[in-house]
Curated annotation (Swiss-Prot):
Pfam families: DUF1508 (PF07411). InterPro entries: DUF1508, YegP-like_sf. SUPFAM superfamilies: YegP-like. This is UPF0339 protein NMB1088. Signal peptide: none annotated.
Amino acid sequence: MYFEIYKDAKGEYRWRLKAANHEIIAQGEGYTSKQNCQHAVDLLKSTTAATPVKEV
């Protein structure tokens, strides 16, 4: 798996998580700066298997 950061048609930075076969698994909202988008990716990368899942 790997993350991609890209600029969309509206000029916002977005991230997407892709599987080894290059299919999109997850994607995030648009950010006005590349730094904020990278921060979101870094937060996701810091999660662990112990991170809880909550049903709402």
